[in-house]
Amino acid sequence: MTNIRKTHPLLKIVNSSFVDLPAPSSLSSWWNFGSLLGVCLGVQILTGLFLAMHYTSDTATAFNSVTHICRDVNYGWLLRYLHANGASMFFICLYLHVGRGLYYGSYTYSETWNIGILLLFAVMATAFMGYVLPWGQMSFWGATVITNLLSAIPYIGTDLVQWIWGGFSVDKATLTRFFAFHFLLPFIVTALVMVHLLFLHETGSNNPTGIPSDPDMIPFHPYYTIKDILGFLVMLTALAPLVLFSPDLLGDPDNYIPANPSTTPPHIKPEWYFLFAYAILRSIPNKLGGVLALVMSILILAIVPILHVSKQRSMMFRPLSQCLFWFLVAVLFTLTWIGGQPVEHPYIIIGQTASVLYFLIILFLMPMISMVENYLLKW
């Protein structure tokens, strides 16, 4: 008798995706982050669902409802901090996942890569709107500053901002719609994840060497299922101390002050995972230029496949490109640090230098180094 997992209409989809899926035998731990992101998404949806049962999206009660969750709801503090720090873990895994794709040339699967970029934008939008919901000082002013950037768009900018706000300032209407979208977007993200996996399974996984691995494949289960479970345990080991011992480590103290439109915090800044993009935005004196640079800092990933001129897919055997890649990582760390600093000397010039280097490395230096490596291959 044939196994039910291979014949049942629903189970055979799961089987071909997670059980009998042929996978390259050489996948390293860098291939764990896809499954870790799936776990993060699941945790965020579950904790978010329970938080939404107690949260009220009204300017008069939003801040107090979050306090109520932490103080009065059974394990409400755990739900709240799992959700907040789970988002940080989500972005750590996201950035490592994208970095893996850049390093090993996974972007040559252009459909999977482009859906991934769309996913990155969707998750960033979700996180931004979620940060507004506790209705603290940084929530309010962060929402005001970031949405106000759209006013830089010629002709329609001002009308667009007021349309998003639902009035002439960030107020009750803004909070209500942000809550609605924050609730909806994770389900859209889940649908996009399925499309992402669909495109990935059309081509099969890349591997660290970047060489086709068709002759050397192993079944996903049990080899990679057990490896993924180890990944989950490692992530949980990192997340648990953060949530249980220092849950506010990555947050902003200003967000424990209720939103007050008449008092501006000394330094308005987003959550740590947006600081690199925020630094790029601030490094350009022109408002529209800053907004374009902000969008391009992520959208630049879409043109990476076009800029791939190397004869080798992966950076595994390309030491010059490896050096440049890690230099890019250092630039991103610098931008993240600068994004959290006040706008004054010497931070301004450091931010501007790092921003120029970020675009310079991706647009010019990477392709140039690849061409040099191609030339060296002839020797």
Curated annotation (Swiss-Prot):
GO terms for biological process: mitochondrial electron transport, ubiquinol to cytochrome c. Disulfide bonds: none annotated. Heme b b566 binds at H97, H196. Heme b b562 binds at H83, H182. Keywords: Electron transport, Heme, Iron, Membrane, Metal-binding, Mitochondrion, Mitochondrion inner membrane, Respiratory chain, Transmembrane, Transmembrane helix, Transport, Ubiquinone. GO terms for cellular component: mitochondrial inner membrane; respiratory chain complex III. Its cofactor is heme b. It is found in: Mitochondrion inner membrane. The keyword Transit peptide does not apply. Binds 2 heme b groups non-covalently. The chain crosses the membrane at residues 33-53, 77-98, 113-133, 178-198, 226-246, 288-308, 320-340, 347-367. A ubiquinone binds at H201. InterPro entries: Cyt_b/b6_C (IPR005798), Cyt_b/b6_C_sf (IPR036150), Cyt_b/b6_N (IPR005797), Cytb/b6-like_sf (IPR027387), Cytochrome_b (IPR030689), Cytochrome_b_C_euk/bac (IPR048260), Cytochrome_b_N_euk/bac (IPR048259), Di-haem_cyt_TM (IPR016174). SUPFAM superfamilies: a domain/subunit of cytochrome bc1 complex (Ubiquinol-cytochrome c reductase), Transmembrane di-heme cytochromes. GO terms for molecular function: metal ion binding; ubiquinol-cytochrome-c reductase activity. Gene3D superfamilies: Cytochrome Bc1 Complex, Chain C (1.20.810.10). Heme 1 (or BL or b562) is low-potential and absorbs at about 562 nm, and heme 2 (or BH or b566) is high-potential and absorbs at about 566 nm. Belongs to the cytochrome b family. Component of the ubiquinol-cytochrome c reductase complex (complex III or cytochrome b-c1 complex) that is part of the mitochondrial respiratory chain. The b-c1 complex mediates electron transfer from ubiquinol to cytochrome c. Contributes to the generation of a proton gradient across the mitochondrial membrane that is then used for ATP synthesis. The cytochrome bc1 complex contains 11 subunits: 3 respiratory subunits (MT-CYB, CYC1 and UQCRFS1), 2 core proteins (UQCRC1 and UQCRC2) and 6 low-molecular weight proteins (UQCRH/QCR6, UQCRB/QCR7, UQCRQ/QCR8, UQCR10/QCR9, UQCR11/QCR10 and a cleavage product of UQCRFS1). This cytochrome bc1 complex then forms a dimer. This is Cytochrome b. It comes from Dermanura gnomus (Dwarf little fruit-eating bat).
